[in-house]
């Protein structure tokens, strides 16, 4: 089960705990208090996506890599001996500096399907709760989750809205990568759109990027030392990787296999 699958399984148990409380107290007030408690325990849920602060692209010498049916450039050398592919959908790219990139491929609508399975709700009810477009793609559902904050659950909210928004706040708090504490940024390329969790200016130990297309998503985790002589990974270097991602057509993959 993927990380999001495990996350959503936790959410499935919320309903029973809420039912007893609701017998004695008002719905909206209870959910407003609960949402603010989540915000106090997990301050990251108060963050929402903003535009990327640096769109420059590193021009440093590097390499073009090809894994899992995709190719992209990195502005660094690669340690081929330590680079490993632990499964059919992920690869760990080792860099001579000691840093690494975890690259993985995600099937279409994995997040949406996990939500439907874990919440035990049917698609029609979720569409009524969150809107027609919410379950259209993993990108649209992720965007919905990231845009919600505890402040959107008010004491005078309609019961259905309060329940739905609180559920999103809880999902957001549990699913958020550690890097998201320093910022959440929108990502756009020619073929993908998604989000970056983490501001490289704060030199986090890890920084995640998720990008989505109609035929599935890609995830990059940039891992680095948080101190020492190795230069920190910069936004321009991350942009070099993300902005050069492209899917390799099947015909091209076949042709490469013949050479």
Give the ranges of each region predicted by the language model.
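Surface-exposed acidic loop/strand-edge motifs in secreted or periplasmic proteins
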Residues: 87, 92-162
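N-terminal targeting sequences that direct proteins away from the cytosol to non-cytosolic compartments
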Residues: 2-115, 122-123, 204, 215-216, ...
